Structure formats: structure tokens, C-alpha cells
Amino acid sequence: MLFGRLTERAQRVLAHAQEEAIRLNHSNIGTEHLLLGLMKEPEGIAAKVLVSFNITEDKVIEEVEKLIGHGQEQMGTLHYTPRAKKVIELSMDEARKLHHNFVGTEHILLGLIRENEGVAARVFANLDLNITKARAQVVKALGSPEMSNKNAQANKSNNTPTLDGLARDLTVIAKDGTLDPVVGRDKEITRVIEVLSRRTKNNPVLIGEPGVGKTAIAEGLAQAIVKNEVPETLKDKRVMSLDMGTVVAGTKYRGEFEERLKKVMEEIHQAGNVILFIDELHTLVGAGGAEGAIDASNILKPALARGELQCIGATTLDEYRKNIEKDAALERRFQPIQVDEPTVEDTIEILKGLRDRYEAHHRINISDEALEAAAKLSDRYVSDRFLPDKAIDLIDEASSKVRLKSHTTPSNLKEIEQEIDKVKNEKDAAVHAQEFENAANLRDKQSKLEKQYEDAKNEWKNAQGGLDTALSEENIAEVIAGWTGIPLTKINETESDRLLNLEDTLHKRVIGQNDAVNSISKAVRRARAGLKDPKRPIGSFIFLGPTGVGKTELARALAESMFGEDDAMIRVDMSEFMEKHAVSRLVGAPPGYVGHDDGGQLTEKVRRKPYSVILFDEIEKAHPDVFNILLQVLDDGHLTDTKGRTVDFRNTVIIMTSNVGAQELQDQRFAGFGGASEGSDYETVRKTMMKELKNSFRPEFLNRVDDIIVFHKLTKDELKEIVTMMVNKLTHRLSEQNINIVVTDKAKEKIAEEGYDPEYGARPLIRAIQKTVEDNLSELILDGNKIEGKEVTIDHDGKEFKYDIYEITAKKETTES
């Protein structure tokens, strides 16, 4: 907070505020202590104005003690509350509006009046202070704004009228204290000062990724000039931020743009104390260069080379390479200064420097833990943006969310509002119908409700005023989860139970295959508990086994349990990648080829949904070289697409399915997967499968996979369970047509028997159900049998399937197939 611009009396007010907080044993300095501090300076304008409204020091003390009372014995350093910080900020804003160089007691009072929340605002309300009249009285007591300040400002601006209309003076903004503090960029600011102090080509250009703080360095220079922390050569300089869009805007005719830019350059040359800051420096190239006219960069080149124009540029690495480097004459006139992304530790320090501003704006307390969480979580989970920008945005949005949540109107107030509206409408209807007695009763009822509403509203506001809303680590995690879809909040009891019982959830859809289900469940639990390797995917698995045993179904079931729907799974059918060059479809077509701008089928989906299940189905069908691209995904959790963007796979579950080796195992007596689920038989099966797998895939690929799981052949009992699941799905579909079906155990056993084929797994069951159930039901529906609203029982008598149709309460009719 900038206390250097406070008058001596205003500084004493802050000292009195601290003394009052200590006297009342309060742990923070709030708006009420600032008000008490103002009353302790009776000669100040603020105290005189308040006394003129019959508000005395004793009355204020009485109200404050009544509202918040004395605290426990306070310990440690006193800090300003977010609302008190906001009041100081508002007082500086008031001083600037009135063209005053210093902040006095009167400006602090104006700040308290503008801050309509907090204890001070409640004191004013309780003492019946007319806010509008009080403000007018303060302005009247001050007299007219100081003309000397206005004239000084006018004289300063008269030298550069065109420039003032097109640019923002960062030094003036820094003097007003409205620029955010710049933390941890001393090295870069010093380097900028060194380049600016050169005799010729004294033009630094700040190059760095978006969001690393390039513009902040120019603002830091302006603040250093205001504080006199620069060499003699830069003292009293003005840093003017020029927007090329504003310069070009409105130049309808040829030569108008060039004339405007020349005038700006002449004013800068004559003034001799202007440093031009051009954000997005690459916009110089081509600006105003339509119809053969020369562009802005060519107009500026001579002045930049001779040192007549001091210019700081800022641009990204990509734009510098595309626009500045290709023009060698322009490039040599600028001295590049690399601005690197700060570390997580540096980002935490930057956030601590900005904390006061965000606390004042959102009127909440921001803890150190929240700042650390913002820096660490944004660094880990938001991979396509840069620190400190993404961490600052995270703090800003989380603070906004907490603030809005704490100020949502309670339901009882909304109910009273609705009741008032209802009574108003009834009263208007009664007046219209000339039922005046009824209208009078309704008017009285409305008055009572309005009073009740005001009382409830004041009670809620008073309760809110006494609360110190704080931003916690959990709030930061909630916002990150909203941005990325990755669950980071603390695990609640419901989710904990769901994760612990994940095997049961998966078994509702996948019958048998305990090894696969257990392995997948453990990987998900490790990730959610925060124990997984942060540089690798949540888990990577190869599912081996014959067709139709549930490999793909398990991936679908996992996607449904994690995201609520099977469609959340990213499915890549490897049969589409039988040719070597097809790998480009995963990461995007190379430059110059059709589809380069569309991105890769895999990388784009993962960029949009970083928390997902990825299924590579039937991997043995793809060309072996396709899997080379997955090596760094399995090991380091990232993949670079054809546009050079790094895609983060660290929050994905990667599942690959294959039935490689299934034929060889089928030829062996024990290796039909049946009865080989445990003991040495299962190990033999596994070794056989691994041998076939090694013949098909390279060792460096297999070595990176977390687990290779062999699926077992489905037994008859398991097939019967699958029949029950399939019948339940059919029952659900028919219930939408108001048809109820019941399939007996005998019928299910017969369907399982007809659909049993150890070579093809569960898929023949689909055909068996179609043949025995669906075909006959469709004929019954189309044959004129009105079975809507009736129940159909499907049974097997040892020879054939029987279909009994009957009303829910009536006797059965019997038809046979």
C-alpha cells in the first residue's frame, strides 16, 4: 500500500487507527478503526464535517463497541482488513479526481463514504448520516480543486497534445498508485535501463511467452522513475504506452496515418523526455501500409537508429520471429531482452506482492496457503498457459467466486420479495375491481411485509459485515477443477466410498475379469489420493484376450464411473492406422499438407479434455511404427503436436486392447483361458501371451506400460449373468413403449446355451437374444397383438420358447413360437 502520499495528519489518523485496534484487542485494523482515527484528529476536515452532522467521537466509540465489542488479547502484527485497504485505495482515487497531490483526512472520509460495506458503514447508518450531504460538505470544505496542479498538468501535456490523445502516461498512473506492484523483475528492469541509456539504438524489446510479465516490466520502469530509483539520464522521463490500433483508427484517407505518426514523433523529439512503450511490437509491421503506402515500422526506422526516439517494445517469441526477424533492418534497431517464465517460488512472491490489491478489490482475506496452491496447481494442471498470469487469474476468479457466494441473497429474503409482488398484484386487481376495503387490507399487508423485508435485509447485512471471508486452498482447487475437469478438491465421504467400491461399480457392467478390474481401480485410487507419479499418466494398460470377453467394455465402464457417461472416453480404432504414414492423423498433418490447421485426432481431444480415458482398440491391427509416437506419452506424460504445442497426458488413463496370441492359446489344451485364472496355469498363459506380444511389439514400448492383463474365457455361469444384463437393457427399452417382459431362468439358461462359444466370447449372446427374443417380440408387436400395456413372459419348456401375454390383472393368453 502506498502511504508515502499521505499528509502528516492522515498518517496520524492511521496511527490512531492502530492504537484503537490495540485498545479494543482486535487482531486487524478495519474501517471502524479508520473512522475512530479520523475522530481522534478534531482539527482535520473529516472530523469537522462529521461533527457538523452531530456525529461525535463518543457516539462513534459507543456504536463501534456495541457492534463488534472488545476482542480477546491480540497477539502479533496488526494487518489492514481487505475493506480497510479498499478505503485507502478509494481515498487515493478521490484525491486524484480532485487533482490533489496528497491524501488527507477528507479523502479518507470520502473513501469511507464510498465503501458502503463494513462496520464504519453500519455506524454511519445507525447514526443517520446522510451520505450524499456529507460528501457534498467535504467537497465544499475543500473549495475548488487546486488550480496549480491542474495548470502544471496542462503545461506538461501541452508539449505533446497528439501523443496524449493516443497514448497512456504510465508515469502519471504510477504516481496515482493505481499500477500493480512489480515483484521479482529487478534484473530485467535494470537491463532495460542499461539499453535505454545507450547513445544510439537505445531501444529494448522484451521477448517472452504470453503472460510472463512483459508489460509489467514497462510498468515497473514507470514506478522506478516516479520513486527516483533510476540514473540521472532517466529522471523525470515519461513512459507513454502507445496502442497502434488507436493510431490507425479513423485514418480514412491516404497520408492521414503517416501525418499523425510523424506528428507524434516530432512531439516526442521536441519534448525530449518521452520513452515510448509499444505493447505488441509486431503490430508496427504493416500498420497503415495499405495501397503501397509505407508502414509504421519504416517510418520509425530512421528515428530509432539515430537515438532520437527511445522505444521499449514487447512481443511474443513467435511474433518476433514471424514479423521482426524477417525485417533485418528493423531487428538491428532493437536490443532483445529475454523475459523468462518465473519459477513457482518466484510466482508465489509475485502473488504476495499483489495480494493487497486483490484483497481490496474482492474484500476478502487471501491466505498464504491459497497463494501457494494457486502457483503450484496452475503450474501442474494448466499446461497451455504461463506463470504468473495463470496463477493471478486463478486467484482473481477464486476470490470472485468466494465473494459472490458469501453475498448471495438468502432464500427467506427472496420468499418475502415474491410475497410482496403477489400482494401488490392482488391489491392492483382489487382497486381495478373497485373492492376498496379489500385493497386497503392488502395495502396494510404489503406495508407489513415491506417492513419485515427491510428488517431481514438489515439483519443479513449486519451479519455479513462482521464476517471476514477468506480464500482457502480448497477454493483454488475448485476453480482449477472447473477449468480443466480434473477433480482436485478434497475427497468427501461420498466420493471416498465410491472410489473404495470402484470394483463393485465396474463389475455391474463387466462380468468376471477380476485381475483387470482390480488393477484399473487401484490406479484410479492412487491418482485421486495424490500418490501417482506426477510426470506419468494415471495408468497405462494392455488388455489381452480372445474376442468378446469384455476388454473394450471395461474401458467404457471405467469412463462411465469416472465421468458419468461412456461417451467421455476417447476411442482410437487402431485398424484405421494400418499404414505407417497414418500416424500423422494422431498428432496432425505436417505443414503444407491438407488438414494441418485441424490438429490431430488424439492431441486435440486430449487438449480439450485433459482428464479422460483413452482407448486404443485392437492395437495389433496398426502398423508397428505407429507405437513409437506413444513412447514419450507412456513415460513422460506429454506429446508434441505438429504445431509445436505440448499436450498433457498426465491426467489420462491409457488402455490398449489386443487379442494377439489368442489363436496360439486356443490351440493349446489349457490355454483356452478357461480354468486358468489362478496358480501356475495362469502364469503359463501369461508367459505364452507375452511371448506373442514381444514378437509383435518392441521391448521399449512394452517396458513403459504399467500392467499387461490377460482376460479369461467366460464360463457358462458368467454368460448367464451377461444374459441377465442384456435382458435388463431390453426390458428398459421396451418399458419406454409401455411393454413389460419377464424372462424366466430356464429361458436365460437356454439363451446362454445357444450363445455359448468359447472362441467368440459374449458376442454370440447378442445374436442369440435377437433370434430367440427380439425377432418373436417384433412379430407379436406387428401382428396386431395389442401387447402395449401388457406383460409378456418368455419361458422355455425344454423344446421351444413360449410367449405368454396377459393383462396385468387379467387371465393369461398363450401363444407359442
From Swiss-Prot:
Single GO molecular function: ATP binding
CDD domains linked: AAA (cd00009), RecA-like_ClpB_Hsp104-like (cd19499)
Residue ranges, annotated region (II): 471-662
Location of region: Repeat 2: 80-144
InterPro entries the UniProt entry points to: AAA+_ATPase, ATPase_AAA_core, Clp_ATPase_C, Clp_N_dom_sf, Clp_R_dom, ClpA/B, ClpA/B_CS1, ClpA/B_CS2
Keyword Chaperone (UniProt): yes
Transmembrane segments: none
Region (Repeat 1): 6-71
GO cellular component, one term: cytoplasm
Residues annotated as domain UVR: 417-452
Protein's name according to its UniProt entry: ATP-dependent Clp protease ATP-binding subunit ClpC
